[in-house]
Amino acid sequence: VLVKCGIKDGMTLGFHHHFREGDYIVNMVMEEVHKMGIKDITICASSLGKAHDPIVPYIEDGTITNIQSSGVRGKIGEAISAGKLKGLAIMRSHGGRVRAIESGETRIDIAFIGTPTCDDYGNCRGIGGKSDCGVLSYAMVDGDYADKVVAITDCLVPFPNFPAHISMTCLLYTSPSPRDTE
């Protein structure tokens, strides 16, 4: 999916945090970005917590050089405080993130939306499946404004997945998560 989306150095990748400390989307995507040798990535995430500690080596090696978020906790916060992030750490409220994206101040090249359920056409819902989280409100702005949008799910459901929190008209690709087979 990263190749199909045209991933390259210097891009901004969008993520949300509906799964809280159970999120593995950021780690999974950034591991692949790192393996591809891509550098100078800006992560624009609604929040980053202890679940994302595995991306610290990518901060240290320059894979990730900027972070925009509502907050950072755990080892990411420690790495930023220790001066390991080569670029900027911009902290905004959730609404401030939405405003920055809607106004064009922040441009997301590729958004990765972890969704509890999704059909083959990309209709995403935060309800159902193994990872039920409610609505996908933090990710709606990513779906509407990112240049390319990828839905990642551990539960593909029959079309139509309705009512969709994020419509298939926003999506470019859907991708079953490795956890889809668990």
Residue ranges and their predicted role:
Residues 64-126:
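An acidic, phosphate/nucleotide-engaging active-site surface
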Residues 138-155, 171-172:
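Structural signature of FAD isoalloxazine-binding scaffolds in flavoprotein oxidoreductases
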Residues 4, 96-105, 114-115, 134-143, ...:
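A generic local secondary-structure boundary/capping motif
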